[in-house]
């Protein structure tokens, strides 16, 4: 056997052995065949009392929601984890879940939602509206309403 074919056979043998190792390690159906099991989203906010709902959204009962603030900054790390997470809470809106009392969030934004009130079954619709209009959202609506009344139509 000439010496020029010996290196070629050696390289082919090495290639056959190394590719066999990769094939043995793969599960049936390929490396992505196992479904990703959902896990709890990362903790965030003051005292880690909230959960990440998106890369810039941190919400929790009793603390409300932080969007784009330093409290929600750690939620960006959720994008770099290989498996998906579930923030928890009841399903609301189109693809969201209840994040705090009266607030429904998905990975992009949050909206006020009466279905997310804690005692929504025991409250009348007028009480639900009053609860949603409390706090910062209610203050903003009152300011907008007051400024629109001052303008001539």
Swiss-Prot record:
Keywords of this entry: Amidation, Cleavage on pair of basic residues, Disulfide bond, Hormone, Secreted, Signal
Positions bearing Glycine amide: 29
Location within or outside the cell: Secreted
Cellular component annotations (GO), alphabetically ordered: extracellular space; secretory granule
Keyword Metal-binding among UniProt keywords: no
Main location class: secreted
Secretion signal span: 1-20
Keyword Secreted carried by entry: yes
PTM note: Seven disulfide bonds are present in neurophysin.
SUPFAM superfamilies named among the record's database cross-references: Neurophysin II (SSF49606)
One Pfam short name: Hormone_4
Molecular function per GO: neurohypophyseal hormone activity
Cysteines paired by S-S bonds: 21-26, 41-85, 44-58, 52-75, 59-65, 92-104, 98-116, 105-110
Family: Belongs to the vasopressin/oxytocin family.
Annotated function: Vasotocin is an antidiuretic hormone.
Protein's name according to its UniProt entry: Vasotocin-neurophysin VT 1
The species this protein was found in: Oncorhynchus keta
């Amino acid at each position: 056997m000439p010496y020029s074919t010996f290196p070629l056979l050696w390289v082919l043998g090495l290639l056959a052995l190394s590719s066999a190792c990769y094939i043995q390690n793969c599960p049936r159906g390929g490396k992505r065949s196992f479904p990703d099991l959902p896990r709890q989203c990362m903790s965030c906010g003051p005292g880690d009392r909230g959960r990440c709902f998106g890369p810039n959204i941190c919400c929790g009962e009793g603390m409300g929601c932080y969007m784009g603030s330093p409290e929600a900054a750690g939620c960006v790390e959720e994008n770099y984890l290989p498996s998906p997470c579930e923030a928890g809470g009841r399903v609301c809106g189109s693809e969201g879940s209840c994040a705090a009392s009266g607030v429904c969030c998905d990975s992009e934004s949050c909206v006020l939602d009466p279905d997310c009130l804690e005692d929504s079954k025991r409250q009348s619709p007028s009480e639900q509206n009053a609860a949603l209009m409390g706090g910062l959202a209610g203050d903003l609506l009152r300011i907008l309403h007051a400024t629109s009344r001052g303008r001539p139509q």
